[in-house]
Amino acid sequence: MKAIFVLKGWWRTS
C-alpha cells in the first residue's frame, strides 16, 4: 500500500 502513502504525500505537497 505504498501508493496510498505516495498519493497522500503528493496531495499534501500539491
UniProtKB/Swiss-Prot annotation:
Query: So where does this one cross the membrane?
Result: none
Carries keyword Amino-acid biosynthesis? yes
> Which controlled-vocabulary keywords does the entry list?
Amino-acid biosynthesis, Aromatic amino acid biosynthesis, Leader peptide, Tryptophan biosynthesis
Can you supply a Gene Ontology BP term from the record?
Answer: L-tryptophan biosynthetic process
Q: Does the keyword Amino-acid biosynthesis apply?
A: yes
Family matches, as InterPro entries: Leader_Trp_op
- Function recorded in the entry: This protein is involved in control of the biosynthesis of tryptophan.
Protein name (database record):
trp operon leader peptide
Which organism is this entry from?
A: Escherichia coli (strain K12)
